Design a protein with these regions (language model features):
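Phosphate/nucleotide-binding beta-alpha loop and adjacent structural elements of enzyme active sites
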Residues: 1-322
Length: 322
């Protein structure tokens, strides 16, 4: 039986949760308005741009003007400090050239966030003189970074064909020795339907985008085994779970893995799999509850310690048998 006092308490609790939610929305809106005021000059264009979903000329307080959509504007507004760090030039609709010293990249504005994350160590590893297998190459940014870190070759797997023109431009601009495959990875060879958002701000096997496309999938075990790579980087939403079914023998053909993980369940399964395959979790960069980048290193010391022990047992067993 529910008493009147109980109903009143539930009512109050419900109203409080609504008020808290509304306050949260107001705070987010106010924060956005303040950032807009502090970073831009052409305030009268902001609302029409958001409502019409069309490109509008937006002038920032550093004097630069770009023809932007609302999502592109938010990237620059919310990361305004990066406009001081990088030279950003618009060379077409949804096409920007980003430069930082010798580093030159062409792509969408989302590439700016990827570049900054990598410069902050997202994919940092010892790849000097090594071959890197880059699964989820996006627009070629990570391939360029691996090359700048000394990789002698980068093997790129990127299933979205529209990204390949950027990959080719970026590896040419930065003189990257690369091999490009228009494929994704999975448990077996075949094709798969994926969803994605426009304007190319999200893509993955798990996302619920407005657009659907079919991509070619290669067996991840086959790709690893034939690559001859020393380092593997995987950033393809949902595809990382295919590593769980790869044999330890094949996983150990690689020295170092960099894996972007998109669910806590896959994270736990991968940690268990790699530890059982004689890898140690060297580092983990957590971005939120679901998203993190894990760095697994093959434990050569433990393997070399096991081998003499096994070899030492063999003569003793032989003596017992005689």
């Amino acid at each position: 039986m529910i008493y009147t006092s109980d109903l009143e308490f539930i009512n109050v609790k419900l109203h409080l949760s609504i008020v808290v939610s509304l306050l949260g929305i107001v705070m987010i809106t106010l924060a956005g308005l303040i950032r807009t005021f502090l970073t831009t000059r052409a305030l009268f264009n902001i609302l029409p741009m958001k409502l019409s979903r069309k490109r509008m000329p937006i002038t920032f307080r550093n004097g630069l003007t770009y023809q932007l959509t609302w999502p592109e504007f938010r990237i620059l507004r919310d990361n305004y400090s990066l406009m001081q760090k990088y030279a950003i030039k618009q060379v077409g609709d949804n096409l920007f050239k980003i430069q930082d010293g010798e580093l030159k990249l062409v792509g969408s504005l989302y590439a700016l966030l990827v570049v900054e994350a990598m410069e902050n160590g997202m994919y940092y590893c010892d790849c000097d003189g090594k071959v890197v297998l880059d699964v989820g190459g996006y627009q070629g940014e990570s391939a360029v970074f691996f090359s700048k870190m000394g990789a002698k070759k980068v093997i790129i797997y990127e299933p979205v064909i529209s990204h390949h023109r950027f990959i080719k431009q970026n590896i040419a601009l930065n003189r990257v020795n690369a091999e490009i495959h228009c494929e994704g990875i999975g448990d077996k060879n075949g094709t798969q339907m994926v969803s994605y958002e426009e304007p190319d701000l999200a893509f993955g096997l798990l996302s619920k985008g407005r657009n659907i496309m079919e991509i070619k999938i290669r067996d991840v075990a086959e790709v690893i085994e034939k690559s001859g790579a020393n380092v593997v980087k995987i950033d393809c939403e949902g595809a990382e779970k295919s590593l769980i079914n790869v044999s330890s023998e094949i996983l150990r053909k690689i020295e170092f893995y960099i894996i972007e993980v998109h669910t806590p369940e896959i994270r736990r399964a991968l940690i268990e799999k790699f530890r059982a395959s004689n890898f140690s979790l060297e580092k983990e960069m957590e971005f939120n509850v679901s998203l993190s980048v894990m760095f697994f290193k093959r434990n050569f010391a433990a393997e070399s310690a096991e081998e003499p022990l096994e070899m030492g047992l063999m003569p003793e067993l032989a003596l017992i048998e005689h």
